[in-house]
Every structure is written in structure tokens, then in C-alpha cells.
Amino acid sequence: MAGLALYCRTGFEKDLANEVVEKCAELNVYGYPELKTNSGLVLFQCYQAEDADKLAKTLPLTTLIFARQLFAFSERCEQLDTSDRIGPILNGCIEFPECGELRVEHADSTQGREISKFCRKISVPLRQALRGKRILTPLERSNLPVCHVYFEDSTTAIVGYSYPANNSSYPLGILRLKFPNEAPSRSTLKLDEAFQLFIPKKEQAKRLSGGLHAVDLGACPGGWTYQLVKRGMFVEAVDNGAMDEALMATGQVRYCPEDGFKFQPRKNNVYWLVCDMIEQPQRVAKLMATWIATKRCQETVFNLKLPMKKRYESVKEALQIIDQCIDQHRAGPYDLKVKHLYHDREEVTVHMRLNT
């Protein structure tokens, strides 16, 4: 038994499973997905056991839309004796590469949170036992693989490992952010998470600097505009609804009560285009790609609202529209990242810019 374990938002297991099967086939790795609805977990069982390690190294987490975390698993330890849960877990880790960190985790769900205290409690003796067997280094080392023990419940654990170059450094693969009280809506967290995920830290000072000009399509009441203003940008907020008064009082926002699909910026100095309009994903994708292809902006972050069924297929259709639009305008190569963020719901967030 060997394969890839992947975390996702509860309810999106089928979408992640479809995506993983397709991506694995592109790497000539074959198997089948195993999932339970609303578990937040997908197990891709490899037909060839050695392929699990290959996937952990070569299937980039950053390219998976619906996955929050991934690791190669070797065993599912079931019906663990409450008097000795650690023994079977150790046996499942014997052939792991030397690991520099242990993560004991659970699902991001009501059931998962019920065992979070148990996971914290067992972490200390489990870490000591792994170090005693030299599976884990005496001190944490971030350059070595991570040992994962994922508890489905208090008597069932999946054991595996991931590589530091291809995993999420966040607990459960979740970047948790604090809602700023002065922000006009919770949607502000989506753009904040997108900026932190898509823009490397060493480049944020330049690409998210004060003084840049931005356009926010579908801006009201101003959740996304808030993130731009907070960073010192000047924003054209496009929407027929009402904007937050505090944002308007900053002097950094020009309100444009117009249709986002028809809006044209006054000047050719827009760096960022952001968009969280509730519209068909195909329409939004074409609009965003047109702005990028015609160089009306340099970078864009936008959301694609998804249908209840065939969400992965809907995303692929939208991305194909983007590719066709860029090709039609002969705009050249471009960088594209897509992720189902923690703060997203029935939507995914896209970052895009020309590769100059």
C-alpha cells in the first residue's frame, strides 16, 4: 500500500481526485483515488509502490488547484490499540528517509477538530519515539523531509513523508489570516492570502509597493480595494454599488460607477487589476486575459466562481479561454497560478502576468 495523500477543503474531494488522476497520468504514474465525501482527504493509490516517492518529488503542489498539502504515504494504521498507538506507527515509518520534522495532523473539519487536542498530546511521545529509532533527527532540520502522521480518527493514522521543496509549510496546509476590523468585508482575506501565496516574499516590496496604480472590478463595498489601499496604492474602484466611506476618505480611491466589463482606465499606468465579480467564469477569464494580453495592466488576481458540479472541468475551460486569448493577441508567454484558497468558497483564485 503506497501512494499520495492530499488535503483539500471538505466537499471538494471529487474535484481534487479528478485533478490528481489527470496530473499523475501526465507523469506516467497510474493508480486510483480513494476518498470519502466531506473528509477533506484524497488518497491516490499507486499501482507501483515506488511511484509514491516519485510523485512526492515531481508533482508540484503549487500546480495543484484543489490540494492544500501532499505527502507520500506508506501505510494506513487501522484499529490502533489505545494502549500502544505509537508502535504500529513506528513500523510504518521504518523505510522513510531521515526526517527533520514531525507533523501530526487531522482534517480541517468538525470531526477533525474534535481530535486536535489528541493530536497535540500524542505528538510529544511520538516525536521522542521517532528520534529513538533515528527516523527523526535530534533537532528539527528544515532541509530534510517532513514525517507526516495524519489521524483520520483516534485509532486510524496515515503515515508518510514529504519533501521541503514540495510541501506547504503551514499547519494542515492552511495560511490563516486575521480579519482586519477596519476592512469592509471578509472577502479582503482572499486577496491578502493570494498576494502572500502568489508573490514571493522577496518580491513583494516591489510588486506590491505604495504608489502603484490599480483597478478593482466589482469593488463594492471594498474588501479587495482595502488590501490595495493598505499597501499604499491608488485604486479605481469600479462598481455600481456603494463603497465603504472610510476607504473613500483615504483619498486613494476613485469611485467609478460603471459596468466592469465595459470600464476603460483613464490612463495607461495600471499595474494591478483585481476582480471578484459574481459572473460566469468564462466571461471573467476572457476579460482578465484581454487586459493582460493588451497590456492594460501588468499583473492580475481574480476569482472564478464555480458551478456546483464539474468544478475542475469548469476551471480547465476557463484556463483554455485564457490561453486562446493570449495566443490570439500574440502576447507571448505568460505565468499563471490557480489555487483554491483557504478563504475561497465555491471559487478559485487566479494570478496572471506576462512572462517578461
From Swiss-Prot:
Subcellular location field = Cytoplasm
Q: Which UniProt keywords apply?
A: Cytoplasm, Methyltransferase, rRNA processing, S-adenosyl-L-methionine, Transferase
Give me the residues that bind S-adenosyl-L-methionine, please: 187, 220-223, 239, 259, 276
Q: Does the keyword Transferase apply?
A: yes
Query: Which of the seven top EC classes does this enzyme belong to?
Result: transferase
Q: What superkingdom does the record give?
A: Bacteria
Q: What does this protein do?
A: Catalyzes the 2'-O-methylation at nucleotide C2498 in 23S rRNA.
- PANTHER family per the UniProt record, alphabetical: RIBOSOMAL RNA LARGE SUBUNIT METHYLTRANSFERASE M (PTHR37524), RIBOSOMAL RNA METHYLTRANSFERASE FTSJ DOMAIN-CONTAINING PROTEIN (PTHR37524:SF2)
Q: What is this protein called?
A: Ribosomal RNA large subunit methyltransferase M
**Species:** Pseudoalteromonas atlantica (strain T6c / ATCC BAA-1087)
Gene of this entry: rlmM
